[in-house]
Amino acid sequence: MRWPRGLTLAVVLLTAPAGCASSGDERPEAPAKPAQGSPVAPTQVSPSPSAEPEESDRVEEPAERAGFHGKIDALPAALAAEIRGTTWKPGCPVPLDGLRILHFNYWGFGPAVRRGPMVVNAAVADDVLWVFEQLFDARFPVKRVALATEFHPARFEQHRRITSHRSVTASFNCRPVVTPLGPGDDYSQHAYGLAVDVNPLQNPYVTTDGFVRNRAAEPYTVRSRSLEGMIHEGDVVVRSFAAIGWEWGGNWSGDKDYMHFSLLGR
């Protein structure tokens, strides 16, 4: 098992407010870190149930098209200024200098190699980059990797439904926990840069009574299906995050957050 660099941080944060209760279910055996250049077995997927409109968000050009390339940097001054007052605000539980920006290649839908940025906590930057290297080697499709957008509480009123084909894989966002009941009072693990949401459209948050906020995600509520970008128990996504000590919201008791992986399992 890959030794999680964020383990000490997890111990420190055990007293942090919980966003959602995680289950006591046993997790699958985590894989050992593959030897350099040894790919994880490819994930077999079926086409999406319907074509999605092309997103207008800017896409970075891959550094190389043939292999995985990733890097970790301190937040550039321009980016720090850009997110100040939007996804980061004074009083957030992690300072700006406690964050890092990753840039890495990933397999998009299609498939095609794309490249995107992700902001995470500095303590877990190496581990998160390693996870996305495993996903790249397995050719697991990621719809889009991009920075999170500013959280607006009014958009998350209790049981308010939306229709959106946007599906952005992202991490840091200084915001509260959000459920179908609306925003909570506690910080989400995203506010610490210790959580990643992968393909949110294809892996929605589903309540125990079957409520899904995004109507466009309804085809993905049947978790026995194998549609492009879906995450399943024991697959390369779950196993790779487990190898760095992170837990999956798809294993929660009660509500399921199929997109969500976090260091503290909540």
Question: Where does each model-flagged region fall?
Answer:
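N-terminal low-complexity, Pro/Thr-rich disordered segments
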Residues: T8, A18-I83
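Sequence contexts marking disulfide-bonded cysteines in secreted/extracellular proteins
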Residues: G19-A21, G91-P93, N173-R175
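Compositionally biased intrinsically disordered regions enriched in Thr/Gly
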Residues: E54-W107, A112-P117, S188
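Catalytic cores and adjacent binding grooves of peptidoglycan-active enzymes
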Residues: D57, E61, P180-R266
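Active-site acidic/histidine clusters and adjacent loop/turn architecture
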Residues: V94-S164
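Structured segments of extracytoplasmic/periplasmic soluble domains
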Residues: W107, W130-K143, R175, L201-P204, ...
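Mid-length scaffold segments of soluble, non-membrane domains
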Residues: R139-K143, Q158-P200
